[in-house]
Regions:
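Single conserved hydrophobic/aromatic residue that forms the stacking wall/gate
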Residues: 1-7, 12
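Glycine-rich beta-alpha junction loops
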Residues: 8, 24, 57-61
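Long, compositionally biased stretches enriched for glycine and/or charged residues
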Residues: 14-15, 21-24
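NAD(P)-dependent Rossmann-like dehydrogenase/reductase catalytic/cofactor-binding core
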Residues: 15, 29-158
Length: 158
């Protein structure tokens, strides 16, 4: 999602590019890392042991650890052939926002965990796609967590 939104100008121009190799710059990797810290904080608040994205990539792709996420992503050979979405209505943006970012942020809000970076991307995706992903997405309310205490929410995900 983040790559698609930040690279949305290239989507609009219909310029084809390597989604991960060109789409992720060092600065975009920093933004992804900031969002990932929020994801990990929400998971920890739920009592879920979550690996940071970099650690997950090292483990999943059997890579040597790198100093930063950008270098790590650039070292994943299987990412090299993946092309970008051709428009901002692509499932990488729409589905990842509704089913990934909205639940993370919404559950974070219910637990009192701030998610300002994730919130910003949900708002940007909503504006770019002309939709309200806060209403359409999988919110804590839609997941049956409305009015629950943090402990009750943790019990639901165990």
């Amino acid at each position: 999602i983040l790559i698609g939104l930040v690279g949305s100008e290239m989507c609009i121009r219909d310029r084809s590019y390597d989604y991960y190799m060109e789409g992720i710059t060092p600065h975009i990797a920093d933004i992804i890392s900031a969002c990932d810290k929020e994801r990990v904080a929400v998971c920890q608040a739920l009592g879920v042991d979550a690996l940071a994205l970099g650690d997950m990539l090292v483990k999943s792709y059997k890579l040597e650890p790198k100093d930063d996420l950008y270098d790590l992503i650039q070292s994943i050979d299987s990412y090299r052939a993946l092309r970008n979405p051709t428009n901002t209505k692509h499932r990488f943006i729409v589905e990842d926002t509704m089913s990934g970012l909205v639940p993370l942020a919404s559950v974070g809000h219910a637990l009192g965990i701030p998610t300002p970076m994730i919130d910003a991307f949900v708002n940007i995706a909503s504006a770019v796609c002309g939709r309200n992903f806060w209403e359409e997405g999988r919110t804590a309310e839609k997941l049956g967590m409305a009015g629950k205490t943090p402990e009750e929410i943790r019990e639901m995900v165990r």
